[in-house]
Amino acid sequence: LFTRPRRFGKTLNMSMLQRFFEATAKSNAYLFDGLKIAAYPEYMAYQGQYPVISISLKSMKQASYTDAFYMYKNLIAKEYEKHKIILESNQILESEKEIFRNIMEQRADQNVYLNSIRTLSDILEKYYEKNVIILIDEYDVPLENAYHEGFYDCLLYTSDAADD
């Protein structure tokens, strides 16, 4: 959790962490050429080695719970789309692939979305056989907006249901 004042570079730092750790088809190592970290092989050994879930909730400023949830579904579906390579894997059960597809295509029930980040993390961990790095930027925007728009209690109730 990065707690810093506005305009302090949190988003930039999270983007840098994503590019450093994320396992991608094309290596991001060149982005760190000439930087001090590149001089440390013990750190560079971690570069490009982990699955990363990266979501920004900055756009979660809707006037109603329904609209906010619709936007959340879109954000989550886009993140699933980034990881759709796992659908080709034999390591992932067909039932897990079906859940994955339903979320990616925005056909899942509301309750499925409440745990969708955890579900994606579990599936990615199984596929890559490595821990997953989860980066959530602007995490406070949905709650702050819900408070100002009058659906804060509804949002909290929904988040309590996700914990069950």
What is the predicted role of each segment?
Residues 130-149:
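Conserved P-loop NTPase "ATPase switch" module shared by AAA+ and STAND
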